[in-house]
Regions:
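Generic hydrophobic alpha-helical membrane-span motif
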Residues: 33, 144-147, 267-270, 369, ...
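Active-site adenylate/phosphate-handling loop in enzymes that bind or generate adenylated species
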Residues: 139, 290, 348-407, 474, ...
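Short secondary-structure boundary/capping segments
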Residues: 331-333, 374-381, 631-633
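Generic recognition of stable, solvent-exposed alpha-helical segments in well-folded globular domains
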Residues: 14, 232, 236, 240, ...
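Acceptor-binding helix/loop patch of EC 2.4 sugar-transfer enzymes
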Residues: 160, 382-383, 387, 539-540
Length: 646
């Protein structure tokens, strides 16, 4: 994994060095840049050495002809196979790196190279002969790629903070996207929370030539029609998962794994527990003192049981509730505000793991492809109930509204209450009810009038247009399509990349191997949700291979006890933040509504913990990116990468 940056049509070697060094955390091992006055282009690269650790694999990298120069972030897991193909076609190699395979692959296949890649990547190639830039982002959006127009040219990078080194005004907030953040806790691509900064969507290509930019989609999340669905045998699925997982062990450094003790991460470990050298396992623990009001099972107990069964050592990290010291730094590395409380867990775990490994495998993505979230089974199951039962369910929920202390509810009861509140709506609106932090009417009351006028008419529309694209598919297929198109890349993968790369650790997600995603998309609904059992076929594939307790265990993930944090350790800090002059003078929110959110949460009238957390993250974001000038990058020496001598 690395950090890439570039300027086309507005190139300045001093600026591209600053852009590159703004991402030194993404690549502390090495750095390089290249500048071509004739083509008015500059490229920069920070390297985290994982495959072929020698300096010969440094970037920017040139092909043997001197025509193409590449900067690349990611891993190509099938690079050895591609290398053999290219050698058979007459290509020679100076290194053992996947970078050179990608470079020669582009030289041979051109734009079609993306269809040959099995990996996670974002890259850009400059063609010196045709004088155009070609860039691409991987199919699922595992690696980031942001860009902006600047003067008469074009800027791109792995992180937005690099772009600010070229143009400080790009860091201005895009307040017209504020309601997206309040609704979803993230901003949907291609939009961002920064003024005039865009995100290249997953599975897209970008070209820049003669001052003109164009983008095109080369891959989309599969959305098969009902008659295209094909059942899968449990053993066949296990083989696919095992193949995807073992293929991602390729590295010249130690590999580790995030283990929650849940089905997904335990399944990965089962596939590679006999690997040589052994993988290193990391898990999080919160302790009994943080469980009040957050009824969940301690992940570490299950993770420890799995590690013992597989005879592997495990490293446990206690996540303390004292998070105020880390939060500003995490927000800085995220670039955009993300209101998922797991940002703290992921950041601390990768920081701890960084002393022992540069690569971590994660079970992320399994929920989105196998239907693992409560909203999947809730929305799906309600479709089988008559309308009068759904309406009655909703009516009962309105009668008991406010009768119970929300703070005392378990997560399952909270979800049941949420389901009942939306039971009388159509499937799409039920799904959205499970997918948002603030409802649209809450946003309208929360924002000051001068902001409501510049917001999108309805934040749901970004989901609705994709939902309507799937009219020939089953309801469950359409819901999974939405999650894979938006929730997965815009929140989970963004969170995963930024928090891990902040600590110079590469995160790999085997469940999102393209071949696995495409095959699982074609599995019938009843193999994903069987009765009320989620991820049914994955459980069947792992049955007898991992402990029964894990097969039967309900989903928990790495979710931290945010309700406990908000009511206890963060309470005084929250008071200081929301009563501060900076927060009250932002001119964003009706302060009476903010006060009511907090009071209702404290009194148990409503569970507003996640909403309060979202407002806290947003204020910390303002303090990092608005109140302070952009952080100056470290002045690290970069090597000038010259073309090969011909």
């Amino acid at each position: 994994m690395c950090g890439i940056a570039g300027m086309v049509g507005c190139a300045d070697p001093h600026v591209v060095r600053r852009m590159t060094n703004a991402m030194i955390h993404r690549g502390p091992d090495d750095g390089g840049y290249w500048f071509d006055h004739e083509g008015n282009v500059a490229l920069g690269h920070r390297r985290l050495s994982i495959i072929d650790l020698r300096h010969e694999a440094r970037q920017p990298m040139w092909d043997a002809t001197g025509r193409f120069v590449l900067v690349y972030n990611g891993e190509i897991f099938n690079y050895r196979n591609l290398r053999s193909q290219l050698i058979s076609k007459g290509y020679t190699f100076r290194t053992e790196s996947d970078t050179e395979v990608l470079l020669n692959g582009f030289s041979h296949w051109g734009r079609e190279v993306v269809h040959h890649l099995d990996g996670q990547f974002a890259f850009a190639v400059w063609d010196r002969m045709e004088r155009f830039l070609f860039a691409a982002r991987d199919p699922l959006g595992i690696k980031p790629f942001v860009y902006a127009h600047h003067k008469d040219g074009f800027l791109f990078a792995s992180e937005a903070k690099a772009l600010f080194q070229a143009e400080a005004s790009l860091s201005a907030p895009a307040y017209e996207n504020l309601s997206y953040y309040l609704s979803f806790s993230w901003t949907p691509h291609p939009l961002s929370f920064f003024n005039d900064v865009a995100k290249l969507p997953p599975g897209y290509l970008l070209e820049w030539k003669d001052g003109e930019m164009s983008i095109a989609q080369y891959w989309d999340v599969p959305l098969p029609s009902e008659d295209e669905l094909r059942p899968i045998d449990a053993d066949e699925l296990y083989d696919l998962v095992r193949q995807a997982t073992r293929s991602q062990l390729v590295a010249d450094v130690p590999v580790g794994l995030f283990l929650s003790g849940g089905l997904d991460s335990t399944g990965l470990l089962e596939c590679i527990h006999d690997a040589e050298p052994p993988v290193r396992i990391f898990t999080a623990t919160y302790g009994e003192d943080q469980r009040e009001g957050d009824v969940f099972e301690e992940d570490s107990n299950y993770a420890r049981m799995v590690a013992e069964k597989m005879k592997l050592p495990i490293y446990e990290l206690r996540i303390s509730p004292d998070i105020t010291r880390d939060l500003p730094e995490v927000v800085f590395h995220l670039d955009e505000p993300l209101a998922d409380p797991t940002i703290i867990v992921n950041y601390r775990l990768t920081r701890e793991a960084a002393s022992q490994t540069k690569v971590l495998l994660s079970g992320m993505g399994a929920d989105e492809i196998f239907a693992g979230y409560p909203r999947h089974v809730a929305v799906h199951a309600l479709e089988f109930l008559p309308g009068w039962i759904r309406r009655s369910f909703h009516k009962i929920s309105t009668l008991v509204q406010g009768s119970f202390d929300d703070r005392a509810m378990s997560g399952r009861v909270r979800r049941l209450k949420l389901l009942a509140a939306h039971a009388d709506k159509d499937a799409f609106l039920r799904f959205m009810g499970f997918s948002v932090f603030f409802q649209q009417d809450e946003i309208n009351r929360l924002l000051l009038p001068e902001l409501t006028g510049i917001q999108p008419a309805n934040t749901y529309d970004v989901y609705r247009s994709l939902y309507q694209d799937g009219k020939g598919a089953t309801l469950l297929q359409r819901l999974l399509y939405l999650d894979q198109k938006l929730f997965l890349p815009c929140l989970n993968l963004e969170n995963s990349d930024k928090t891990s790369m902040a600590n110079s650790v590469e995160m790999r997600v085997p469940y999102l191997a393209k071949a696995l995603v495409e095959r699982v998309a074609a599995i019938p609904d009843q193999q994903k949700i069987h009765g009320l059992t989620r991820k049914f076929i994955l459980r069947e594939a792992l049955n007898g291979r991992i402990p029964d307790a894990i097969i039967r265990r309900k989903k928990t993930g790495f979710n931290p006890p945010v309700r406990y944090w908000v009511r206890n350790n963060l309470k005084e800090y929250l008071h200081d933040v929301f009563s501060s002059r900076s927060f009250q003078q932002r001119g964003l929110f009706d302060l009476r509504m903010v006060t009511k959110l907090i009071e209702d949460n404290d009194n148990g009238v409503k569970d507003n913990a996640l909403k309060i957390w979202a407002l806290l993250v947003l204020e910390e974001w303002h303090r990092v990116f608005v109140d302070r000038s952009p952080v100056e990058p470290r002045d690290e020496e970069l090597v000038f990468c010259a073309p090969p001598v011909r």
